[in-house]
Amino acid sequence: MLRQTAFRSMKLNRTPGRYFTTAENMDTGSSQSPPDTEQKMQPMDEFTKEFLKNQIKLTELQRVILSAGSSIAALVDPRRHDMIACLGETTGVPALENIRDQMRNSDEGRQILEDKPRINTRTVNMDALKKLPENTFGYQYVSFMEKYEITPDSRMEVKFMDDPELAYVMTRYRETHDLVHTVFGMPTNMLGEVAIKWVEAINIGLPMCYGGAIFGAFRLRPKQRQNYLQRYLPWALRAGQRARPLMCVYWEKRWEQDIEELRKELNIEVLKVD
């Protein structure tokens, strides 16, 4: 079974979803292990190794203090994405456990948890996606990223969690955020961000998504707020509820898929924006 344990060589496979780095052979660090050890020991995947190397362990008191501090900072300045990310790690464990269970109960979700794919410029061949037909999800994703001058490398690493698998679920949420924007056809302006936060809140269930949606709306200008209440909010609540569970979608296997077919498959409703 191929695991994404190392991303050493960029390889473009002409099958749907394989526009990312794969490891042909796993390097376990030794040529052979004793038979009993080999059966008992499972190789640690690359994500877990990297996470444990950078993990910052907290006591319960430290976690409470960090949660309170990041909450206040995020309320004072919703642009503090670092504080919002920190808040998500220190308060979102029950929701992440629910998401993980949902993924385990889905064939596609289980495969994601097993492979632990990453989305960044080291693992996704953006140039290859750019050469796909314009109607494909992969082409639309690259076009979205270029239009709004976004890089997939900008997502913060998860550091303050105890469980590596839950840390991956949080990482997966962060790294697929722009894919959600793409498939819902929603821009990255303030109105679009608040709307997508509502979609994610309803569909995924992370507390930080609810917080971002509620408090982000206070930053809207009066004219934007009217448009938000009349069009964007009703759409976001409806779209988040109707869509298939977004965390169970193996997006990387959909690069070559027609984006309208993908939307139909995932039951995604697109709002016509000005």
From Swiss-Prot:
Disulfide bonds: none annotated. It comes from the Eukaryota. Residues 22-36 have a biased composition (Polar residues). It catalyses: a 4-hydroxy-3-methoxy-5-(all-trans-polyprenyl)benzoate + H(+) = a 2-methoxy-6-(all-trans-polyprenyl)phenol + CO2. Zn(2+) binds at residues 177-178, 181, 193. Pathway: Cofactor biosynthesis; ubiquinone biosynthesis. Its EC number is 4.1.1.130. Belongs to the COQ4 family. This is Ubiquinone biosynthesis protein COQ4 homolog, mitochondrial. It comes from Aedes aegypti.
